[in-house]
Design a protein with these regions (language model features):
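Bulky hydrophobic segments
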Residues: 2-111, 117-138
Length: 138
């Protein structure tokens, strides 16, 4: 019984980590952060800014949360676990950037959305791979 309580605490902690990180990403995307992250990592034909990398990485963190949860035996959802978790990540990647259309001091940038979606895609790849690895399942 004590082991079950401990496992439930770990599972709840992992779920809080998922939703907590989602809130952090949301806040970082609606709070004015200044122009320091808009540094160019430029080639001659294409402007590539540092914040594009940060957008992708912020969504790639969800892959780490998934894997850590799975290592601890967390069942994220009763059914369609991979699909639901990935759906949350993809919908968040789109909606968080679209939200900036309605915030007066922020600007919607389709390249930011592409960077978000790239991070979400990498997350889905990691989730699918880890889901197929038997050592992560108890």
């Amino acid at each position: 019984n004590r082991i079950m309580l401990q496992e439930e605490k770990v599972a709840n902690g992992a779920r809080w980590l998922l939703w907590g990180w989602l809130i952090v990403v949301l806040v970082l995307n609606v709070v004015p952060l200044g122009d320091e992250l808009n540094q160019d990592l430029t080639t001659i034909r294409f402007v590539f800014r540092l914040d594009y990398v940060l957008h992708s990485l912020s969504f790639l963190v969800f892959a780490l949360i998934w894997v850590l949860g799975k290592i601890k035996g967390v069942c994220w959802f009763e059914t369609y676990e991979v699909l639901k978790f990935g759906g949350i990540v993809f919908v968040s990647a789109i909606c968080i950037e679209l939200l900036q259309i309605f915030i007066p001091y922020r600007t919607f940038n389709p390249m930011d959305m592409i960077a978000n979606l790239f991070g979400a895609l990498l997350t889905m790849i990691c989730i699918v791979i880890s889901h197929r690895l038997p050592r992560l399942h108890r």
